[in-house]
Amino acid sequence: MTMRIAACVAAIAVSASFLLEAQVKSFRPVTEAMLRNPAPGDWLNWRRTDNAWGYSPLDQITRQNVGQLQLAWSWSMDDTGSQQATPLVYDGIMYLPNPRGVIQALDAATGDLIWEYRPGATPPPAPAAARPSGGEQTDIPRLSQRPATGGGDTGRGIQRNLAIFGDKIFGTTNDAHIVALDARTGRLAWDVKVADEKLGYEYTSGPIVVRGKVIAGMTGCSRYKEDVCFISGHDAATGKELWRTSTVARPDEPGGDSWGELPLMFRAGSDAWIPGSYDPDANLVYWGTAQAKPWARVVRGTDGAALYTNSTLALDPDLSLIHI
């Protein structure tokens, strides 16, 4: 009797996997035009559109009926760090960033989990009944519930956003990796280590996607070292780094004299805490940077502007050049 019940439970679980997979199999690749002008019910960027206006055209909720809203469902997010997440929503699927690189896909109507990705966790193999003859993976796994290992012990594990383009979801980790996942299954497509977390580097925000490039800003620039924070662009298909722009002016670069005679290892700060935005008409990416470190000029040992701290940078997404 017990074996019969277990078999029934397994059959139901496999059936549920097929139902959830059917939702994801209808996935349509996301284009640049969609990122610029999403369907009214979609939220495809941190601030919905690539220009980061944060405006939704939906009008069902009004001043008159907002008081009638009720809880439809709730979801317990990962508890390994601080939460500052903005999810993506596309075709009824919610893609949710969690602390320390954990990414989940939920049915936006019901809150049911479709898949989950955890750095360092290996997804279980598909049940035999869920494998078609061609060998294609058709079930959607919930990965191991052990704590995520990709975040290390850096910071508070904050991950503010994800990006979506083509058939992939893009995220960053607190140990300075950028990852791409199959949006249908959550399977890892590629993983690129961008900087050394042992030197303090980490991501606290996810990337944006512009003209086929995954662009992300680095943080963790409070420790003095022979390098500085930066914004980098990567091929969305492979993760290959295409360019890197320092957010601190180096001694031999334009603006380098704004730090006086300080050597590079004493030029700190200019973290890129928040995701950038894109103006397609000007073909420019805009990114904000934080203060110089130490904060006080007298402690830094310079009275200059300390470029490019406390700034909004305009970058050519193809060439990485800063437009001043």
Where are each of the predicted segments found?
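Bacterial N-terminal signal peptides
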Residues: 6-17
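Blade/loop signatures of beta-propeller domains
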Residues: 28-71, 250-252
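Repeat-blade elements of multi-bladed beta-propeller folds
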Residues: 43-47, 82-102, 139, 150-177, ...
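A short helix->beta-strand "capping" segment at the edge of beta-propeller domains
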Residues: 57-79, 144-146, 259-260
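Short loop/turn segments that connect beta-strands within beta-propeller blades
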Residues: 108-110, 183-185, 236-238, 317-318
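Asp-box/WD-like beta-propeller blade repeats and closely related beta-sheet repeat scaffolds
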Residues: 119-165, 173-231, 242-264
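Beta-propeller blade signature
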Residues: 228-240, 305-319
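Conserved small/polar residues in nucleotide/adenosyl-binding loops
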Residues: 322-324
